[in-house]
């Protein structure tokens, strides 16, 4: 079922950390989940052109810290950091709590699955051919060090009357290997013919714990020599 499940959720606690990091009580759980959803939806909409790849939310007993990882942090920060203060006030008003907002730069933006999906969506909305858009993103990811990338687009591609799914795969994307570090992103392109869904999987290599050796293949295993049978 590795082909069906979200690869990020499948690898939580193995080689992927949670994006919401807090320990709730039974009473506070629904409220915290609702606040996290509101914060992410608000920031994604407001800062769309900054290229947000991840939004981390951390809570302590009295404090709430939001870390925004973006490809273009300068757009968010503004002159002398004034835009960050305004953003902090907007988020605080949204949930009615004091919030601390930090901005981090996404060093390898082309190797981020979420940014890759949004890039394809933006090109499709500008009427770029879907195959050309997919190939351009794949080339960028490979230059950034990705070991494998798969892109899937589904909908009325090229204005066709019947919706279909097309995908490209370069390198290898082992979805069943839990130690494989796989990034996953989803986006939607709103075109005149309807919505087109985009999914991106990026394989960044295998993560092995200290002292754990990679599995040996049949070629690496020592071959057993058979002793000649003695005749009776």
UniProtKB/Swiss-Prot annotation:
GO terms for biological process: translation. Residues 212-232 are annotated as: Disordered. The keyword Protease does not apply. GO terms for cellular component: cytosolic small ribosomal subunit. It comes from the Bacteria. GO terms for molecular function: mRNA binding; rRNA binding; structural constituent of ribosome. Residues 39-107 form the KH type-2 domain. CDD domains: KH-II_30S_S3. NCBIfam families: rpsC_bact. HAMAP family: Ribosomal_uS3_B. PANTHER family: 30S/40S RIBOSOMAL PROTEIN S3, SMALL RIBOSOMAL SUBUNIT PROTEIN US3C. Binds the lower part of the 30S subunit head. Binds mRNA in the 70S ribosome, positioning it for translation. This is Small ribosomal subunit protein uS3. It comes from Campylobacter curvus (strain 525.92). The lineage of its organism: Bacteria, Pseudomonadati, Campylobacterota, Epsilonproteobacteria, Campylobacterales. The gene is rpsC.
């Amino acid at each position: 079922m590795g082909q069906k499940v979200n690869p990020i959720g499948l690898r939580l606690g193995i080689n992927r950390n949670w994006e919401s990091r807090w320990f709730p009580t039974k009473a506070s759980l629904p409220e915290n989940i609702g606040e996290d959803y509101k914060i992410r939806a608000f920031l994604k909409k407001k800062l769309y052109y900054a290229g947000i790849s991840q939004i981390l939310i951390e809570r302590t007993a009295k404090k709430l810290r939001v870390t925004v990882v973006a490809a273009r942090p300068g757009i968010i920060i503004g002159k002398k950091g004034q835009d960050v203060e305004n953003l902090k006030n907007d988020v605080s008003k949204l949930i009615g709590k004091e919030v601390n907002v930090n901005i981090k730069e996404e060093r390898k933006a082309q190797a981020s699955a979420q940014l890759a999906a949004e890039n394809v969506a933006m090109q499709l909305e500008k009427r770029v051919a879907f195959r050309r858009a997919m190939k351009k993103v794949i080339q960028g990811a490979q230059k950034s060090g990705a070991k494998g990338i798969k892109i899937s687009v589904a909908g009325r591609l090229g204005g066709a009357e019947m919706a279909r799914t097309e995908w490209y795969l370069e390198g290898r994307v082992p979805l069943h290997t839990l130690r494989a570090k796989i990034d996953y992103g989803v986006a939607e392109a709103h075109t005149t013919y309807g919505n087109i869904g985009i999914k991106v999987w990026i394989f960044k290599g295998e993560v092995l714990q200290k002292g754990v050796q990679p599995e040996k293949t049949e070629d690496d295993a020592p071959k057993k020599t058979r002793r000649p049978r003695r005749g009776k």
